[in-house]
From Swiss-Prot:
Protein name listed in UniProt: Bifunctional protein FolD
Gene: folD
Ranges annotated as spanning the membrane: none
A GO BP annotation: L-histidine biosynthetic process
Functional summary from the UniProt entry: Catalyzes the oxidation of 5,10-methylenetetrahydrofolate to 5,10-methenyltetrahydrofolate and then the hydrolysis of 5,10-methenyltetrahydrofolate to 10-formyltetrahydrofolate.
UniProt-listed Gene3D superfamilies: Leucine Dehydrogenase, chain A, domain 1, NAD(P)-binding Rossmann-like Domain
Entry-linked PANTHER family: C-1-TETRAHYDROFOLATE SYNTHASE, CYTOPLASMIC (PTHR48099:SF5), C-1-TETRAHYDROFOLATE SYNTHASE, CYTOPLASMIC-RELATED (PTHR48099)
Keywords per UniProt: Amino-acid biosynthesis, Histidine biosynthesis, Hydrolase, Methionine biosynthesis, Multifunctional enzyme, NADP, One-carbon metabolism, Oxidoreductase, Purine biosynthesis
Length: 288
């Protein structure tokens, strides 16, 4: 069996086009365009690349994008003060603080300071709690983007055995909640899991997010499984690969996401969707 490739680039572009049309309709009706504030502290090269892609996506769909590039020496108090200012700004619908933050700044304190209805990354405990209670509002971007991919490919998830490899706050844990909502019987594995291979071999839907190149051998994949590879790893030769051995896995799976061009583009597309949702549902619903 040769797996069908789940093309995240194409789906992400569709999502962005849909958002752009809705923004045009808002502006044509005399309403304001959604506003996103992107905050970067320091000069981490990877963070700069991610932030640039988010700003570009904002411009593409017609959002008002505001950039705050702060020096590495910024104090926690200064960053919290900026967030308070943005929380009070009625033209800003979403606040994104790029992680990781420099040493000496408490990530949790910063993320919790963002108003929940402007938390377009979906990391605030309020939004994670809403997802856990089956009443989601703004949802964590990567897990929600993965669900969108499955939906757009008309993959019926109800009753599937889903296995999530990795239990991070950003992907693994919220992903497990999304999968429960999608009707899956869900297992989350982590560094203390015994006999990882056994879990992988029984997965109808496998989602891998550990950040280790080739961590899951293709021979572990169940015939006909759906494989979602969240990993983005750059090898010494410059090649970008996922957490799953792609060629071997693609020979056994029914669907698989490539790296790059699978999950990555969906994370930014979902951020854009969340910002539009924050604007239209919480801040400026039809200009009321």
């Amino acid at each position: 069996m040769a797996a069908k490739i789940i093309d995240g680039k194409t789906i992400a572009q569709q999502v962005r086009s849909e958002v752009a049309q809705k923004v045009q309709a808002r502006v044509a009706a005399g309403l304001r365009a959604p506003g996103l504030a992107v905050v970067l502290v320091g000069s981490n090269p990877a963070s700069q690349i991610y932030v640039a892609s988010k700003r570009k996506a904002c411009d593409e769909v017609g959002f008002v994008s505001r950039s705050y590039d702060l020096p590495e020496t910024t104090s926690e108090a200064e960053l919290l003060e900026l967030i308070d200012t943005l929380n009070a700004d009625s033209t800003i619908d979403g606040i994104l603080v790029q992680l990781p933050l420099p040493a000496g700044i408490d990530n949790v304190k910063v993320l919790e300071r963002i108003a929940p209805d402007k938390d377009v990354d979906g990391f605030h405990p309020y939004n994670v709690g809403r997802l856990c209670q089956r009443a989601p509002r703004l949802r964590p971007c990567t897990p929600r983007g993965i669900v969108t991919l499955l939906e757009r490919y008309n993959i019926d998830t109800y009753g599937l055995n889903a296995v999530v490899i990795g239990a991070s706050n950003i992907v693994g844990r919220p992903m497990s909640m999304e999968l429960l909502l999608a009707g899956c019987t869900t297992t989350v594995t982590h560094r203390f899991t015994k006999d990882l291979r056994h879990h992988v071999e029984h997965a109808d839907l496998l989602i891998v997010a550990v950040g280790k190149p080739g961590f899951i051998p293709g021979e572990w994949i169940k015939e006909g499984a759906i494989v979602i590879d969240v990993g983005i790893n750059r090898l010494e030769n410059g090649k970008v690969v996922g957490d799953v051995v792609f060629e071997e896995a693609a020979a056994r799976a029914s669907y698989i996401t490539p790296v790059p061009g699978g999950v990555g583009p969906m994370t930014v597309a979902t951020l854009i969707e969340n910002t539009l949702q924050a604007c239209t549902e919480y801040h400026d619903p039809q200009g009321k």
